[in-house]
């Protein structure tokens, strides 16, 4: 069983990924978007996904 703090951290990390995905979706559909913003969002999503994966892996090690 996970603690409340662990649950909150997981929800935060998932929420961060969802928010970044929404930003990316908006950027893709916008005619005003630029490549730099797109790549920064992709990089941020990759980092957020890696952070979540690392956190979950560390939970299973305990």
Swiss-Prot record:
Domain of life: Viruses
Protein name (Swiss-Prot/TrEMBL): Uncharacterized 7.2 kDa protein in tk-vs intergenic region
Protein's organism: Enterobacteria phage T4
Gene behind this protein: y06A
């Amino acid at each position: 069983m996970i603690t409340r703090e662990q649950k909150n951290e997981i929800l935060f990390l998932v929420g961060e990924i969802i928010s970044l995905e929404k930003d990316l979706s908006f950027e893709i559909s916008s005619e005003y978007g630029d490549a730099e913003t797109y790549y920064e969002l992709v990089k941020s999503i990759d980092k957020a996904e890696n952070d979540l994966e690392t956190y979950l892996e560390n939970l299973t090690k305990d």
